[in-house]
């Protein structure tokens, strides 16, 4: 009996180590649909979750407080939030006001969280010129820092340059998207942008399904994480990039476009609260792209 118990404990520890650096993320639509039993199931294979708290013109995610409580009750140790803001979206400018509103609402709702990630990616009708976009993102990051929030940036090598040009030196953590289904930081050419030389987290697969919940898969830290089944069409030899978390314009169209600096561009798709986002891509192979989506207007 003692041997059996010891063997069981070893197996449980092994499972915990395999998933020690696994994380999932999902958009505001999914936030409002995850049940307590879903959370219990998700907690068995993930130590971290990132949920969308703000979605452009659609604003604050109303169910975020109960979702965070559900994740905490299930035993997920690290809970992050992400916000998609855009300077052409209603109620988002100046970004300092939007960030102040988000942080204030979270405090009023009694929400405790580890980090707030600023989602930087393209969507139709969401952005102005590169200079204005860069100033908008920098203001958002600096405002969060001034409020004492642990803040980082989510983007990809392609989305970053398309959205904010050569903006660099923000000095915050990077969560990058590269859909190569490889939970590691071995793909340095895909996170060396914006002045970053090392990342905190990688979104390595999208459009996956865990416990009946639509999620994107992420890796963080320096431990191990078994690759989950996500999807992302396109990209050859793992050399494309994209970003996800999704956004849509005020007219209800959305985009989570994948782009590359290498031999191909990845594609992914994501649903938004008013439409579906998709990233375009070329070439074939097992791939890397990105795309979950959530709406912004």
Swiss-Prot record:
GO terms for biological process: aggregation involved in sorocarp development; cell motility; cell wall macromolecule catabolic process; cell-cell adhesion; defense response to bacterium; glucose homeostasis; killing of cells of another organism; peptidoglycan catabolic process. PROSITE patterns: GLYCOSYL_HYDROL_F25_2 (PS51904). Residues 276-297 have a biased composition (Gly residues). Residues 1-20 form the signal peptide. InterPro entries: GH25_Enzymes, Glyco_hydro_25, Glycoside_hydrolase_SF. Residues 231-297 are annotated as: Disordered. It is found in: Secreted. Residues 231-296 are annotated as: S-G-S motif repeats. Residues 234-275 have a biased composition (Low complexity). Keywords: Antimicrobial, Bacteriolytic enzyme, Glycoprotein, Glycosidase, Hydrolase, Secreted, Signal. Glycans are attached at residue 166. GO terms for cellular component: extracellular region. The active site is at residues 29, 119, 121. Its main location: secreted. Residues 24-235 form the Ch-type lysozyme domain. One of its GO terms (molecular function) is lysozyme activity. Belongs to the glycosyl hydrolase 25 family. Cell-counting factor that limits the maximum size of the multicellular structure during aggregation. Monomer. Component of the counting factor (CF) complex, which includes cf60, cf50, cf45-1 and ctnA. This is Counting factor 45-1. The lineage of its organism: Eukaryota, Amoebozoa, Evosea, Eumycetozoa, Dictyostelia. The gene is cf45-1.
């Amino acid at each position: 009996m003692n041997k059996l118990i010891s063997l069981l404990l070893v197996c449980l520890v092994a499972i915990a180590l395999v998933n020690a650096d696994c994380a999932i993320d999902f958009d505001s639509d999914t936030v409002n649909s995850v049940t307590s039993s879903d959370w219990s199931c998700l907690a068995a294979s993930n130590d971290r979750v990132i949920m969308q708290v703000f979605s452009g013109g659609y604003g604050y995610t109303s169910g975020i407080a109960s979702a965070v409580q559900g994740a905490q009750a299930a035993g997920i140790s690290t809970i992050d939030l992400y916000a998609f803001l855009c300077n052409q979206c209603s109620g988002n400018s100046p970004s300092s006001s939007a960030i102040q509103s988000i942080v204030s609402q979270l405090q009023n709702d009694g929400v405790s969280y580890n980090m707030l990630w600023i989602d930087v990616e393209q969507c139709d009708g969401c952005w102005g010129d590169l200079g204005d976009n860069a100033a908008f993102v920098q203001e958002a990051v600096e405002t969060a820092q001034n409020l004492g929030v642990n803040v980082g940036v989510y983007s990809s090598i392609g989305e970053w340059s398309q959205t904010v040009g050569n903006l660099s030196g923000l000095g915050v953590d990077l969560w990058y998207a590269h859909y190569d289904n490889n939970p590691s930081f071995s793909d340095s050419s895909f996170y060396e942008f914006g002045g970053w030389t090392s990342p905190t987290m990688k979104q390595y697969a999208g459009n996956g399904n865990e416990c009946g919940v639509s999620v994107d898969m992420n890796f963080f830290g320096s431990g191990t994480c078994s690759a989950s089944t996500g999807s992302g069409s396109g990209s050859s030899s793992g050399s494309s990039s994209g970003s996800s978390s999704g956004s849509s314009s005020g007219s209800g169209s959305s985009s989570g476009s994948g782009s590359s600096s290498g031999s191909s561009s990845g594609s992914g798709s994501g649903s938004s609260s008013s439409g579906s986002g998709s990233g375009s891509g070329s070439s074939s192979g097992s791939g890397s792209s990105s795309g979950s989506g959530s709406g912004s207007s």
